[in-house]
């Protein structure tokens, strides 16, 4: 298959990449998220991703975001490479960070998400949504195509929680080699109980599903999508099961989804422990773009770990690659740039 499937041909005149950075204390649960060397270090992952995408290295965070045990470099290396090759404009959006990066961020004044086993996981959902919607309205005259990514450790568990609350079965993907699905199911079960929910009980109250079982990335992305509604701006949600959960909320809110698509990596689609493809079919997502960076051909062992499913997606990597494809970047050109980024970081060796 082409490195972006289905192949993209229409090059936008005014594209933009947005990356929502958030934290949820759900990621502090041991062995739940691999988006950091330890559960505590996941607090730094979104900030580290932003610094790496912006500067090519980390500035304020103590350690480069990597996935153990092979120190597979963060998907942010792909996002940086794609944005560097395309020179597309981009912004980072702080929606509930514990640690803020030393690079410019648009602040939505959101608090970090709580552990979903608490009765309230996200406070001020409506406020975050409205501020993000206002931001999109300010941006929409400047663009005709927007790709929205995310960086939030623990986000696949909150995605599972929201999907359950809305009435969708299905496993979610993971940042780990071995997807801790049983642990995720247990955490979601405890969260549903703490909030007095049952499967599908919030299908008519999607914003409450975020408040009880979600994370602060969700209302930010949904608010952005709301702000682009009714315009000629094409919106691509960059991510795997997390963005499928966001799409589910959007659908339950009754938004027009004709100009919406999802872009993710081949590694999410091929994850046998998750049901991403089935979920997107159930949700009737108009288009799902699949990006394949071809890391099996790389000389760097750390990049080979992507091919084995050690790490799959994050920091809008799939959407950033989709954007690179729109600009005519080839798979070989892209992989070469990723290798350059890794060598400068001394990562993935």
Curated annotation (Swiss-Prot):
Gene3D superfamilies: 3.40.50.10210
Gene Ontology MF annotations: nicotinate-nucleotide-dimethylbenzimidazole phosphoribosyltransferase activity
NCBIfam families with a match to the protein in the record: nicotinate mononucleotide-dependent phosphoribosyltransferase CobT (TIGR00303), PRK04447.1-5 (NF003372)
Superkingdom classification of source: Archaea
Name of the protein this chain belongs to: UPF0284 protein MA_3887
PANTHER family for the chain: PTHR38811, UPF0284 PROTEIN SLL1500 (PTHR38811:SF1)
Lineage: Archaea, Methanobacteriati, Methanobacteriota, Stenosarchaea group, Methanomicrobia
Family to which this protein belongs: Belongs to the UPF0284 family.
């Amino acid at each position: 298959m082409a490195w972006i499937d289905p192949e993209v041909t229409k090059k936008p005149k005014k594209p933009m990449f947005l990356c929502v950075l958030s934290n949820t204390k759900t990621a502090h649960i041991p062995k739940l998220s691999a988006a950091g060397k330890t559960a505590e270090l996941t607090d730094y992952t979104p900030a580290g991703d932003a610094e790496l995408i912006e500067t090519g290295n980390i500035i304020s965070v103590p350690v480069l975001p990597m996935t153990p045990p092979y120190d597979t470099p963060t998907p942010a290396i792909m996002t940086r490479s794609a944005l560097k090759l395309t020179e597309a404009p981009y912004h980072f959006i702080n929606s509930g960070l514990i640690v803020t990066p030393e690079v410019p961020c648009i602040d939505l004044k959101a608090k970090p998400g709580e552990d979903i086993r608490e009765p309230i996981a996200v406070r001020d959902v409506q406020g975050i949504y409205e501020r993000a919607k206002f931001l999109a309205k300010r941006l929409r005259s400047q663009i005709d195509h927007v790709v929205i990514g995310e960086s939030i450790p623990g986000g696949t568990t909150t995605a599972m929680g929201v999907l359950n609350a809305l009435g969708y079965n299905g496993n979610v993907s993971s940042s780990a080699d071995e997807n801790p699905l049983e642990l995720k199911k247990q955490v979601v079960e405890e969260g549903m109980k703490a909030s007095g929910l049952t499967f599908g009980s919030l299908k008519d109250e999607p914003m409450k599903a975020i408040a009880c079982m979600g994370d602060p990335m969700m209302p930010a992305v949904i608010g952005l999508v709301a702000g682009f509604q009714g315009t000629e701006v094409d919106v691509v949600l960059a991510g795997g099961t997390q963005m499928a959960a966001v799409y589910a909320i959007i659908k339950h809110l009754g938004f027009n989804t004709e100009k919406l698509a999802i872009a993710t990596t081949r590694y999410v689609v091929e994850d046998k422990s998750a049901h991403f493809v089935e979920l997107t079919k159930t949700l009737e997502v108009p288009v799902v773009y699949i990006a394949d960076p071809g890391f099996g051909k790389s000389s760097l062992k750390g990049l080979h770990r992507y091919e084995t499913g050690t790490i799959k997606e994050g920091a809008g990597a799939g959407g950033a690659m989709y954007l690179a494809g729109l600009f005519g970047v080839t798979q070989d050109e892209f992989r070469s740039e990723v290798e350059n980024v890794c060598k400068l970081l001394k990562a993935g060796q």
